A protein has these predicted regions:
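A flexible loop/linker signature enriched in serine peptidases of the S9 family
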Residues: 1-4, 19-37, 48-75, 86-101, ...
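Non-catalytic accessory segments flanking enzyme active sites
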Residues: 5-11, 15-20, 155-243, 260, ...
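Residue-level recognition of a conserved intra-blade site in WD40 beta-propeller repeats
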Residues: 9, 76, 125-126, 169
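Hydrophobic beta-strand positions that form the internal "hydrophobic ladder"
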Residues: 16, 83-84, 131-133, 174-175
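Short loop/turn segments that connect beta-strands within beta-propeller blades
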Residues: 40-44, 104-108, 148-152, 191-195
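Short substrate-entry loop that stabilizes the transition state in hydrolases
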Residues: 240-245, 250-290
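Active-site-proximal cap/loop segments of hydrolase catalytic domains
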Residues: 268, 273-274, 281-475
């Protein structure tokens, strides 16, 4: 998935830096090893700056083993003397830490500016030749940070419960796109000295003036292994703590994709809350913005600690007097859809209904169907035929389809027929199993959608089916 942001002219217009994954066949399918190349328009020469070789000997001149993951998004310094880019260390692991590297075009030296910073870097912008600004996901938010290559110490500029998704700079002024769970994207100006925010646009003010939003609470939940997990709890508008409300457990996809302060018309927490539901959205194991150890834990352990994290979150909220534990549902997409399928076989009567969108149901068939072979190798531990691989065999032994005999709860299954990430046949398998077992089940297949539902009319249908199912079996 390379886009035009991965092609960068130098400021003099004489060189072009770009991302390329110079692999073919099986190697292309099982590896994420892309590199940054620089093309000189005058000489016609191309250089791989991530794996440079000596011109005379053809031998590598740096540690090749350190640059075998994704290397992406080159950005030239204003004087064209350096190139900043993002780099992942491990081949095949698309969720490895995104390190911020700087390449010196004169000396060919590499510098990792985020070696001591346990978060990903993204959206890199130079400020002059000696300072770099970037966005980092930190504790389920997205903040602007900066680092000077000469110092190498990252400074977090902004604070607060928000997602800064993109920004641009003019001199010392920063204009950024920002959203929250309760606000679609608007433009803000950011003071780089103190990180203060000043809203510039108010495109949806007339809409917000005529609707009510629910309160968003930040809740730290103790997990079964004694750690603290940040969980967003979104309450219905006009919430009355003396009343009881139905509760939804939201299972995040990815699986390495943060439950942040994102705003989406596809999975909108405020829209769910507006229907009278309390939404519980945990940042379970495997999600970024809490350090690489927290994120890495999920690989090879899909059925383990992160599932217990889900249950810790919903059980914690269910103990509140305003949460109706007799009216709880569980929803999710992609890996979240897998989570729904797995929980359907082990939830011990917690939930009254499930909704799975494009979820993984059968690990064996999924391995041979997905277009991301490097992903299943990394996250499952390997192929199903590798009987000597204990991690892989544990993954396949705990595939949701192995526990279908324990299903007993109504389930809505949604899929896109053009999904090649988690092919729609996974949803067909799950639907067939549920209906054969006599469990109330409904299949909604969009013939012109892929892994997500993007078309506006289809989105209306999706929401109608989503809330119709919950209202029937949960509310």
């Amino acid at each position: 998935y390379f886009d035009m942001a991965e092609i960068a002219w130098n400021n003099a217009g004489t060189m072009l830096a770009y991302t390329c994954k110079p692999l073919t066949g099986t190697a292309y399918a099982v590896s994420t090893d892309s590199d940054i190349f620089v093309y000189d328009l005058e000489s016609g020469a191309t250089q791989n700056i991530c794996k440079p070789t000596n011109f005379n000997t053809g031998k590598p001149v740096n540690d090749q083993a350190a640059m075998v993951g994704y290397d992406k998004y080159p950005v030239w310094s204003p004087d064209d003397s350096k190139i900043a880019f993002l780099s992942q260390r491990r081949a095949g692991n698309e969720s490895d830490k995104a390190r911020l590297f700087v390449y010196d075009c004169h000396t060919a030296e590499m510098q990792d500016l985020t070696a001591d910073f346990d978060y990903n870097a993204q959206n890199v912008v130079w400020s002059g030749n000696d300072l770099i600004y970037f966005i980092a996901p930190i504790e389920a938010t997205h903040q602007i940070c900066r680092v000077a290559p000469s110092v190498g110490e990252v400074e977090v500029i902004t604070r607060g419960d928000h997602d800064i998704n993109a920004f641009t700079m003019a001199g010392e002024r920063i204009a950024a796109e920002m959203c929250t769970i309760s606000m679609a994207t608007e433009f803000f100006e950011i003071n780089p000295e103190d990180g203060s925010l000043a809203q510039i646009s108010a495109i949806n003010k007339s809409v917000y003036d005529n609707i009510r939003m629910g309160e968003v609470q930040k809740r730290w939940v103790k997990t079964t292994d004694g750690k603290q997990m940040l969980t967003w709890v979104i309450l219905p508008p006009d919430f009355d703590p003396s009343q009881k409300y139905p509760v939804l457990l939201y299972c995040q996809g990815g699986p390495q994709s943060v439950v942040s302060q994102f705003w989406s018309y596809r999975w909108n927490f405020q829209l769910m809350a507006a229907q009278g539901y309390i939404v519980v959205a945990p940042n379970r194991r495997g999600l970024p913005s809490f350090g690489q150890e927290w994120l890495d834990q999920i690989s090879g352990d899909y059925s383990g600690q992160n599932i217990r994290d889900y249950l810790s979150a919903i059980d914690d909220v269910a103990r509140e007097p305003w949460a109706d534990r007799e009216r709880m549902g569980c929803v999710g997409a992609s890996y979240g859809g897998y989570s729904v399928y797995f929980l359907a076989g082990c939830h011990e009567k917690r939930f009254k209904a499930f909704i799975s969108h494009c979820g993984i149901f059968d690990f064996d068939s999924m391995y041979g169907e997905t277009e991301e072979l490097f992903f299943v190798n990394n996250d499952y531990g390997g192929p199903y035929w590798d009987t000597a691989n204990a991690t892989a065999q544990r993954s396949y032994a705990n595939s949701p389809h192995k526990f279908v005999s324990k299903w007993d709860t109504p389930i809505l299954i949604i899929t896109g027929e053009k999904d090649f990430r988690i092919p729609y046949t996974q949803s067909l398998e799950a639907f067939t199993a549920a209906r054969t077992l006599g469990i109330p089940a409904r299949l909604v297949a969009f013939e012109n959608e892929a892994h997500q539902v993007f078309k506006p009319q289809n989105s209306l249908v999706w929401n109608r089916e989503f809330f119709g199912w919950l209202d029937k079996y949960v509310k």
